[in-house]
Amino acid sequence: MKNRWPLINDNIIQEDKDALIAFLSQPNVRFTQSEKVREFEKQWSEWVGVKHSVFINSGASGNYIMASIMKEIKGKGEVIVPPVGWVSDVAPLVNLGMVPVFVDVNMESLSITVENIKNAINENTVGITLVHALGFNAVNEELIKLAKDNDLFLIEDCCESHGAKYNGRRVGSFGDVSNFSFYFGHHMTTIEGGMVCTNDDKIYDYIKMFRSHGMTREASQETKDFYSEKYPDLNPLFTFAVPGYNMRSCELNAVVGLSQIKRLDSNIERRVENLETWLNHLNSKRYFVEYNTKGNSNFSLPLILREPDKNKFEAVCDLLEKENIEFRKGTAGGGNQSRQPYLEKHKYRINGKLVNADHIHDYGLYIGNHTEVEKEQIKSLCRKLNEV
């Protein structure tokens, strides 16, 4: 049975389809990565406020590229990560022989705190993965300074937070490198797709090389010359500088992205308004509502019990199922990633107790927030939830 209130909706509208049809109707058009991809990358860089953007096949691929670059620059070591995040924030690390170190999140932004990061740093620490969960900003000046003072590689995962801001700047412009997801149902979509961003020219070369088999073809002339001079016996067109992947996207996805980005700001505005309505009408004695909403670009509507209560949480889930409202337990990525079985055969570390992450895992969920969700619909659901 179709959900009355789905978790995500299809962002594709007729305008996007018309753009695709117009592109497909051109004579001798190239479908693989070409001019439209480069145009989309340029527009995305301007929108986020970064120097460079590289279009790829998914946000998760971006996590692999960013982790691979961190390893190239810093070598193997420990990387501080949030337990509340997506699997691809952690899986690339263990696959690359690095060690994820989980520290607890705060409730206000569902992100790791400066104090918890400080307590986890040691001589083996090489980086921090900062996840902007559910549209909440996770960055601050103290965190940026902490990373810089300790010479740590700072990754920003912005896959759920397109357009979130800190001090007037969009997230994804603060770290060494950042990624975004354009999967179905996100703030905007390219059907499948993602973007990796940086302000660093060297990292930009790395991103392009890791995107396409590790080849130097798309790298800067300086990088090409370096490898040509060092390895004169190699064909410059087939010089593989890093152990790369094939994570390219194509022109069709870029055409959709170029159409979608025109509506991105208005879509975000609607999401933010819906979150405000949601938090203003929930019973604050029953549900946590004190989120740091400044500069948010809400991805979905969080619903976390204020106090542990298994019976009440089950009753909330029963109500949502009865109302035919789709939801996911544990918020982003199913809750506490350190409790997932994929880690059992790999080395990882938990620094301190994950009190908030476990509470979110056991007593939290989220429901959909998108342009089709109406304010009266939100108010009606809040009234019912407040009676549970």
Model-assigned labels for residue ranges:
Residues 64, 68-72, 145, 184, ...:
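Short, well-ordered alpha-helices that flank and scaffold nucleotide-derived cofactor binding pockets
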Residues 181, 194-199, 229:
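Short beta-strand-to-turn element immediately C-terminal to the catalytic PLP-Schiff-base lysine
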Residues 9-10, 35-43, 47-54, 115, ...:
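PLP-dependent aminotransferase class I/II
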Residues 189-193, 257:
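Adenylate-forming
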Residues 1-30, 35, 239-241, 368:
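N-terminal "arm"/small-domain region of PLP-dependent enzymes with the aminotransferase-like
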Residues 71-158, 165:
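PLP-dependent aminotransferase-like
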Residues 30-31, 35-78, 92-94, 102-104, ...:
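Phosphate-binding glycine-rich loop
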Residues 156-190, 205, 236-239:
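Conserved active-site segment immediately N-terminal to the catalytic lysine
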